[in-house]
C-alpha cells in the first residue's frame, strides 16, 4: 500500500474514480445558502438528499464551496453549520471538503469541522502568488491566516493546495509558486507535511508539469496528489502518477 493519497474531484455523482484513487470528492456545492450545486436560482444536486456513492476502497466526501461559490462569509449561523453536518452524517458521506473561494467564515468553518468529527474534513484553497506573497495583498494575508488558524485548531485532516487556474499554470508560475506554497504551508503555517495535498488539473497537463508536481510530492514527502475534474485525466498520465507514487 502506498504512503501517498491519490484522489480528486468530480461534478457528477455518476462519475466513478479510476483504480488507484482512495479519496473522491463530489461537488461543487457552490450554492452555500441552499447547499446545492449550481446556483440559488438554478440549483443542481444536493448532499442533503443524496447518499454518498459507494466506491470500494474510497473515502467519498462532498465539497462545500468551489469556484463562484456564494454568498461570502459562510457559514453564518448555527443552523447553517448544523445543516452541513447533518448532510454528511445522515447520508453516509465520509466527510466534507471545504473549497474556500468565497471568503468563508473561518471561525464557523472550524466549528463545522469539529462538529463533523469523526468524519474527515479538508480545507482547499488557491496556493498561488497571493498566498506566497501575503504582504502584497489583503487576500493573500487572509488565506495564510485561515490556513494557520485551521491548523492551530487541529480541525482539518488535510489541506489541499490548488496550484492551477482554468488550466495548469505556466512553467514560470509553477517554478515560482508550487514548492514555495508547500514550504509556506508546512514551515510558516504549521501544517504537518502528510496533511498537505498538492492539486492539479488535467487541462494543460503535460509531461513536464506533471512530473514537476510529482517531484514536489516526493521531495517534501507530503500527503499526496488530488486531481480536479478527474474524468478528464488521461490514462497515460494516471499511469505515471501511480508509478511514481507507488500506487
What are these regions, as identified by a protein language model?
Residues 2-185, 189-211, 215-220, 231-245:
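Chitinase-like catalytic core of GlcNAc-active glycosidases
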Residues 223-226:
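Cysteine-clustered segments with highest specificity for TGF-beta superfamily mature ligands
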Amino acid at each position: 500500500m502506498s504512503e501517498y493519497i491519490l484522489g480528486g474531484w468530480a461534478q457528477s455523482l455518476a462519475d466513478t474514480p479510476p483504480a488507484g484513487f482512495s479519496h473522491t470528492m463530489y461537488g461543487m456545492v457552490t450554492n452555500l445558502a441552499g447547499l446545492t450545486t449550481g446556483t440559488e436560482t438554478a440549483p443542481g444536486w444536493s448532499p442533503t438528499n443524496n447518499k454518498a456513492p459507494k466506491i470500494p476502497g474510497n473515502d467519498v466526501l462532498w465539497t462545500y464551496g468551489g469556484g463562484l461559490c456564494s454568498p461570502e462569509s459562510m457559514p453564518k449561523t448555527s443552523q447553517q453549520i448544523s445543516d452541513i453536518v447533518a448532510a454528511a452524517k445522515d447520508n453516509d458521506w465520509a466527510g466534507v471538503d471545504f473549497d474556500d473561494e468565497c471568503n468563508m467564515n473561518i471561525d464557523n468553518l472550524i466549528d463545522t469541522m469539529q462538529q463533523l468529527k469523526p468524519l474527515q474534513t479538508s480545507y482547499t484553497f488557491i496556493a498561488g502568488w497571493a498566498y506566497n506573497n501575503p504582504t502584497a495583498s489583503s487576500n493573500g494575508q487572509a488565506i495564510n491566516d485561515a490556513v494557520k488558524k485551521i491548523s492551530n485548531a487541529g480541525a482539518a485532516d488535510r489541506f489541499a493546495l490548488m496550484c492551477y487556474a482554468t488550466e495548469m499554470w505556466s512553467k514560470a508560475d509553477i517554478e515560482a509558486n508550487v514548492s514555495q506554497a508547500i514550504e509556506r504551508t508546512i514551515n510558516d503555517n504549521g501544517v504537518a507535511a502528510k496533511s498537505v495535498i498538492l492539486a492539479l488539473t488535467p487541462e494543460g497537463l503535460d509531461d513536464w508539469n506533471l512530473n514537476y508536481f510529482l517531484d514536489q510530492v516526493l521531495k517534501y514527502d507530503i500527503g499526496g496528489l488530488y486531481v480536479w475534474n478527474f474524468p478528464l485525466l488521461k490514462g497515460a498520465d494516471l499511469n505515471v502518477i501511480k508509478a511514481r507514487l507507488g500506487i
